[in-house]
Structure formats: C-alpha cells, structure tokens
Design a protein with these regions (language model features):
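Contiguous effector/interaction surfaces
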Residues: 1-3, 7-12, 64, 133-149, ...
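Acidic-residue sensor for enzyme active/binding pockets
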Residues: 25, 105, 137, 172, ...
Length: 201
C-alpha cells in the first residue's frame, strides 16, 4: 500500500462540520487512488499562506513527520510519530497554485497533490470510453496550462529560448512550445469528441 498524509487550512468562514466533511471526502478519494492516509494536519488561519499554503510551523511539523526527523530547536515541541510509514504524498484539501505546491514539496520532502489533481487522477484512471478519456485529458491539460504560465515567469526572460529547433519557432521557449502543444491537443480532443457525438446520432 501507498501511504499519504493530508493537510488543510480552516478559514474563519468555514464551519467545523464543513471542514471535517471535506477532509473525510479527501481521505476517501485518496483510497480510490490506492493511498492510505495515516495522519491529517490541520491549521486555523485567517488566510492561506501565499508562499506554501500552510504556515511555517505546520510545514515543519509535516516535514518532521514525513522524514522521521526530530525537528529543529525552534520547533522542538513537535512530536514525531510516523509509525514507520514511508510517506509518498501530501494531499492538500484545496486547489493550490503551482508555486505553493512546489514550495511545499521542497519543504516537506514528498510529492504534493492538491484536491483537483487527486480528482483528475481518479477520473483518468476510471475513464473507459474514448469520449470519457478525451474529456478527462482536456481537463488535465486545462489544469496544467496555468502551471506552465507560472513556470515561465519563474524561468525568467530567457525561458530557455533557442531559435527554430525541435519544432519551435524563432525565439519560442520550451514553455511556449509546451503551451502551444497543449492548446493544439485540446483542440484536437474537442474535435474528436464532436466527431464521436456525430457518429452516435
């Protein structure tokens, strides 16, 4: 079995019942992907941390748990008890930005999947018909597109540009090429779905 931990921030406008219900649902979704959620980390905050979704102390707590680490002196009150489980993923009960996911991943030391990614992965695994698979792929590509935009910003003005090689136009970066491929693939899939619907009639 694969082991995961879940994490969520409770905002002031979310009731305890709503919050726990959403987390319970995430744990059930995780089971569908073959994960056993062995611990859940929650935090009440006025807003999400813009850098990495969770606050610094909570991120350190998760890092210690995932890595079986006793923690730094600053966070010496943290109790580490991961029961020997090898944690392969942190499941976040919200949709978070690519930079938040990456920062969280770097800090806690395991893969980070937000709620949207978990749901899309379930759809992908369960899609049986050609039309269903095409629709799921469109959804996944749509999820990836803004993440590529953010990656391009982080890559800086160069964006690893090289002119006119490997199918790229002059000065087109890898990221721009990826985004163009995504747009082309979405258009292709949408056309496939239209064709399949016409064939059924």
């Amino acid at each position: 079995p694969k082991f995961a931990v879940a994490a969520a921030v409770q905002l002031p406008n979310v009731s305890d019942i709503e919050f726990e219900s959403s987390l319970t649902e995430l744990r059930e979704l995780a089971k569908t992907l073959g994960y056993t959620v062995v611990n859940t980390f929650v935090q009440k905050r006025a807003s999400f941390d813009t850098t990495a979704y969770l606050g610094v102390g909570k991120r350190e707590e998760i890092r210690c748990y995932v890595n079986n680490d006793s923690g730094s002196d600053e966070f010496e009150e943290i109790v580490i008890e991961s029961d020997g489980h090898d944690i392969s993923a942190l499941l976040v009960d919200h949709e978070i930005s690519p930079s938040q996911a990456r920062n969280l991943e770097n800090e806690v030391g395991c893969e980070v999947m937000d709620r949207t990614m978990v749901i899309l992965e379930i759809f992908h695994r369960n899609a049986r018909s050609r039309a269903a698979r095409a629709q799921v792929e469109i959804a996944r590509l749509g999820y990836m597109a803004p993440r590529l935009r953010e990656a391009a910003k982080l890559a800086g003005p160069q964006g690893r540009q090289r002119s006119g090689t490997g199918g790229r136009g002059a000065g087109e970066s890898h990221t721009e090429l990826d985004r163009r491929k995504i747009r082309d693939r979405i258009a292709e899939l949408q056309q496939e779905i239209i064709t399949m619907e016409a064939e059924r009639k």
